[in-house]
Regions:
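Short coil/turn and helix-start
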Residues: 1-5, 19, 37-41, 55, ...
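Intrinsically disordered, low-complexity repeat tracts
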Residues: 2-8, 12-24, 31, 63, ...
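Hydrophobic face of amphipathic alpha-helices that form TPR/SEL1-like repeat modules
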Residues: 3, 26-35, 64-71, 75, ...
Length: 209
């Protein structure tokens, strides 16, 4: 299989660079271990590789290690450790880390609850074009979550930006706004279009519609 051969070749290149303590390749090896691409799936090894690269200051690995601690992937679940590593990456402007850390702020997971900071982080990640953050911020505006004034047109605009990048949840949410005419002019054809794109990704709400 050509894909498997390419994966194996990539792993070999990552290994050679990792032996020279090149942090991006160490993190890439970690991802291969986490996903089982070109290497047997080994989540504890993935977390260990992320840690090695994270301790070298590599932002992508810091975010991935934080996510491992958040979800218990290859390590015991530890929200406080998750916050430590996500914070390091977020301070360097890593959009996924800011988005994940915003959820910790909202939930008080591994840290003191801080909705104001959570919104600030979510906004920054959304402004950088990170689709899940745009979708989540849209959800906040649609429902008036976390002290935000409800703004359906703002929600629709954020969902659209996220949906156009392929975010299935945003596609479904945007479809709902078009279906009900909330924040946008009602348009059944556009509603169907966005529901269909969401359903193609097997997103439950999109499938339901």
């Amino acid at each position: 299989d050509g894909v498997e051969a390419d994966d194996a070749k990539a792993v070999e290149l990552y290994r050679r660079a990792a032996e020279q303590d090149y942090a991006p390749s160490i993190a890439s090896l970690g991802l291969c271990c986490e996903l089982g691409q070109g290497l047997p799936e080994d989540k504890p090894k993935a977390a260990a590789l992320y840690r090695k690269a994270a301790e070298m200051g590599y932002t992508y690995a810091q975010c991935n290690l934080g996510f491992c601690y958040l979800r218990g992937i290859g390590v015991d679940r530890d929200p406080a450790q998750a916050v430590i590593w996500l914070q390091k990456a977020a301070e360097k402007g890593q959009s996924r880390a800011m988005s994940l850390l915003s959820r910790c702020c909202f939930d008080g997971s591994g840290m003191q609850k801080d909705e104001k900071r959570g919104l600030e982080l979510l906004r920054r990640a959304a402004e950088q074009g990170y689709a899940p953050a745009q979708c989540n911020l849209g959800l906040c505006y649609e429902n008036g979550f976390h002290g935000l004034a409800q703004d359906l047109s703002k929600a629709a605009e954020l969902y659209r930006r996220s949906a156009e990048q392929g975010d299935a949840a945003a596609q479904s949410n945007l479809g709902s706004l078009y279906y009900t005419g909330s924040g946008v002019e009602r348009d059944d054809a556009l509603a169907f279009q966005w529901f269909s794109r969401s359903a193609e990704q097997d997103f439950p709400a999109g499938v339901y519609h």
